[in-house]
């Protein structure tokens, strides 16, 4: 019987298997020091890296130097990204909004661990990621990752502590590993984030001058240099700070990379009246409004230098050093098709007609985003204060319009949008706003560490103990505001049967595994003690905790509908019309097993204590074999006991 592990995949082992498939001669064995004992030596598969390097090189490898970007702790960051964890996401209905109907998620917890838990459920499903990570200004909040060096120097350094006793490190410029710590923190998260993107997906990352250079190099490594799209300059300020000694910085950067540049599609910016006003139709051309472009171009190419006779009889040559854009044969064709314009008098220098109907609907974006178009920092702060009755509960939020522009450029109406440094939840606000304006059904996933608010802050005094509480309340208030505005405007997109605006969200919180420690280390207990254990599951875990733990284990989305019902005295949960059916009751009667099996779910799960004996478990599997389709395959992969 195959039991679920309830831990994220061991990516290191998976990567070794992939290498073995390509280069079997590069796989060897080495002593597994963690699992070996004095009585028994245990070996594990490993990669012969020297041989692998030679296999990938056309020349003899002899320690040649190569261009690379590295820092102290880079290898540890890679190990940290691949390391499995024993954690889960526990639902919190009390803090959610419209739990039963929403497809949005708000996840509280360290984003590195959350990204690991999302690897199976959202692999290749996220169309766009926007993140606004710490800028590493010397006082920014850095996550308590395992790659940090262990020494007395780091242990005594000032910092804050999480509720679990983990130090939440503030990266100061006196730290000898100032840039290294920041690079390690971001690198491991980018590695995991890339896996979640669709093939045509993109990521936007806000950053300032402190780490812009390093971030761009890391993105080139993680996403590939060929998948770089643009580095946008956002004009975040409109007035100088006179106290600055040299320059007053007025901009930040937004790095944009694709998972696969060849697959990514830019929608362009919406065309406005100003853009369309450049087109008119003075000659009543049946093809509609048009504008004209210069027919001459440089440098001069002799084959494209020829005389043009205007309708008025004037002979026209291109200017000195220039030639015509079209060769003579193509020009004559365009002239016959009425695509050449000599002016109303017929005596002007010829120009090429460009019709509005032929222009792509989206305007190609430029790399400078002005505050007049996407907002500035002060405007973002003001608008957030307006949501909270004039109170400033969050410093330096990003403008909603800024993220809306990114959404318009690279998301479609049914995309999943991820922000794993969600802060004040501006991205969630932007997703709801864009959906309200274009009738879309974009879904958001917000991830945020519950960083405690300063007890002297206005937010703490108002009852917000951590940033997550501010973010969730911001989504609630923004959603209600957007819905109210749309209803007041009688917006047609809200009146169609299938376009109900989703302003809800399911709250999930990162926690330890649902299983007791004995589940992972049975060798630590003798047989008599094992028999005394009634359940492998922790006492404080509910059916909903177990259900969502199974969703993560099986790689199912966490936002789909489910229902619970009573069958012969047992509670049965059906997720997304049969993707998974679960019963976590004790002593499950055969009638319930038969009823579940007859529904032919794709997956089914029971609690170990649901069966009093091994024969009962075997009988359960036999019942499923009886009712499952013949092509169902190995039943133990579809039916599990936890």
Predicted ranges, named:
Residues 1-130, 135-188, 336, 345, ...:
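DnaQ-like (DEDDh/DEDDy) 3′-5′ exonuclease domain used for proofreading
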Residues 111-114, 118-121, 185-190, 196-199, ...:
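Phosphate/ATP-binding catalytic cores across multiple sugar-kinase/actin-like superfamilies
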Residues 123-202, 210, 251-252, 265-298, ...:
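SAM-dependent methyltransferase catalytic-core segment centered on the flexible catalytic loop
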Residues 145-152, 183, 210-215, 221, ...:
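Conserved S-adenosyl-L-methionine
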Residues 153-160, 486-500:
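Short, basic, low-complexity termini and linkers enriched in Ser/Thr/Gly/Pro
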Residues 170-229, 465-487, 513:
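Conserved Class I SAM-dependent methyltransferase catalytic core
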Residues 259-385, 389:
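Active-site-adjacent helix-turn-beta-strand microarchitecture at beta-sheet edges
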Residues 555-572:
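Conserved helicase/translocase motor-coupling segment
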